[in-house]
Each structure stands twice: as C-alpha cells, then as structure tokens.
Design a protein with these regions (language model features):
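His/acidic/aromatic-lined binding-pocket segments of jelly-roll/cupin-type domains
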Residues: 76, 83-86, 123-124, 132
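Short acidic-glycine-tyrosine-enriched beta hairpin
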Residues: 99-136
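Ligand-binding loop in jelly-roll beta-barrel domains
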Residues: 125-130, 136-160
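Short beta-strand segments in beta-sandwich/barrel cores
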Residues: 91-94
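A short local loop/turn or secondary-structure capping micro-motif enriched for an aromatic residue
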Residues: 74, 102-104, 160
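Positively charged n-region of N-terminal signal peptides that target proteins for export
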Residues: 1-4
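A short, N-terminal "cap"/entry segment at the start of jelly-roll beta-barrel domains
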Residues: 18-80
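Bacterial N-terminal signal peptides
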Residues: 6-16
Length: 160
C-alpha cells in the first residue's frame, strides 16, 4: 500500500479519535436538578405566567430544558422540534392534537406558535416519572391542577 494512503488513513483515524474524545458526556445529578428546580420555582412565583424555564443543554439539533409551571399556560406547536417530556414532579394533563385557539407566532423562533388552549384534543394525565413523546407539528398544552406546581424536563430534538 502506498505510503500516502497509509498516512491518509492514519490521519483520518486520528481525527476520528480526537473528535470522539473531544465530546464528553454531560452529567446532571439529582442534586443539580433539585437546585435548578428550586431556583425556577422562585422565578415562576415572580411572574404573572407562573412559568419559568432553564436551558440545561443546547447542542444545536437537540437541547434539554427544565420547566416549572405553577399554573396552566399557553398551548404550543413547534413546526421543527419534537418534544419528549419527563415529569420530574407533580401531576399535569397533557392535551394534544385538536385545534389551537387564538394561535399566534411566539415572536422569538420561526415555526413556533402559541395559543390560548386546544379545542377537541385528547387529554392524557401525566404523573411523576411519566415520559411522553410529542412529534413536531402536533399542538400540545400542559394543564396544571389548581394550587399545585409541576416540573418537567423537555428533551427537544430538531425534526430532520
């Protein structure tokens, strides 16, 4: 085998190895989540929406958010993003499908809309430890029971 091919293969292998070792796993401990959640609860108490969100990770085509809701907020539709929700604590009802009411652009991201609610959607009760996947383009609405709060992780993945 010619020397230039051997050197090229060695360079490709080394570059691949460097790329693999440059990316390290990201760990969020239970204690870290509790701290972040406590801070977001305090923030949510200070705003009329009773909603606070913190970005934990952002890798471009996927990201992780920690969300706290003290009461029901807007319905959402994400044209380009699928959501996977893990309920960290609390009970909520997820309404999906149907028709968004008073749908409007959220003004901050292309393809993202908000609404005052959903009519004719299906309701799924979710509890601590539950996980649900919401494909891109599906309207969804998190309803929180009165006088309770909920915290959940949202794993967002860009629809390709």
């Amino acid at each position: 085998m010619p020397r230039s091919i051997i050197l090229s293969l060695a360079l490709i292998s080394a570059t691949s190895l460097i790329a693999q070792t440059a990316q390290t796993p990201t760990l969020h401990t239970g204690a870290d989540l509790q701290q972040r959640e406590a801070a977001l609860i305090e923030t949510a108490k200070t705003v009329p929406t009773g909603f606070a969100v913190g970005t934990m990770d952002n890798y471009g085509n996927d990201r992780t958010l920690l969300v706290v809701r003290l009461h029901t907020g807007d319905a959402e539709r994400h044209q380009f993003w699928a959501d996977q929700i893990y309920v960290n604590h609390g009970d909520l009802i997820l309404v999906y499908g149907g028709t968004m009411q008073q749908e409007r652009s959220n003004g901050t991201a292309p393809g993202e809309t908000l609404g005052s609610g959903i009519e004719g959607g299906k309701e799924i009760p979710l509890h601590t430890g539950d996980i649900i996947h919401i494909p891109a383009g599906i309207p969804h609405w998190v309803k929180v029971a009165t006088a309770t709060s909920t915290a959940y992780l949202v794993f967002k993945e860009k629809d390709k």
